[in-house]
Each structure stands twice: as structure tokens, then as C-alpha cells.
Amino acid sequence: MKSLETIKDKRFLAILFDVKEKVSELFGDKLRQLVLYGSYARDEQDPESDIDIMILVDENEDKLQGYRPGIVEIMTDLSLKYDTFISLSRKTYSHYIEYLDILPYYQNIYNEGIEIYGKKIA
């Protein structure tokens, strides 16, 4: 996974920082990792590209579903604010790790992704 320092565009960094702040407020200490993936992570975006971000949390699947209204609100508010569609996907961290070696989708996120936030584990 790549580091956030690979991004030089200040406007885009401001968007990512805003996403990080809003998602952190929603999930609190349950937030484990935020990862930018897709065309923006590969630096292949065009004017029609959305911003894809995976939210990985320390929560069980049932409780994670309860965060959906908050996620939709963040996506709507920030997409309107920045005039760019921001797509937020959420998964439990344990599910992501369990299927990382199996699912190409998760492998692409890991290999091409840029970590926006990562909780340090002691």
C-alpha cells in the first residue's frame, strides 16, 4: 500500500482530509483504516471519475450496517461540497483481512491503494 505523501494536489488532499475527519467523527475509535483506491489511487482519473475510499472498521457486520445512514450523509454532503462523487465502501477489518488473499477486489485495494488513515496497533 502506498503512502499519502504520493499525492501532491492540495485540493485533492483537502478532500481526503475532509473525508477522514467526517468518517473519524462517525466511527470514533472503531475506525481502523481508510484507503483510497481506484482511478485516483492509480493516478488515472478523468473529470468523470469518482473518488473511491474503503472504510475498514473494528466492528461486527450487524453493527456496521447501522452506520449506513451516516455514510450516505457524508457521501452526499462532501460530493456536493466538492462537486465530485465520493464513494465510500465499508467493511469490517476482520473480513477484509480474512479475504485479502482470496478476493481480487481486496488485493487491488491493498496493492494499488493509498492509506489515508491507519490506526497504529501496539
Where are these predicted regions, by residue range?
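Catalytic core of pol beta-like nucleotidyltransferases
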Residues: M1-K30, A41-P47, D58-A122
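Short beta-strand->loop micro-motif that forms the acidic, two-metal-ion catalytic signature
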Residues: D52-L56
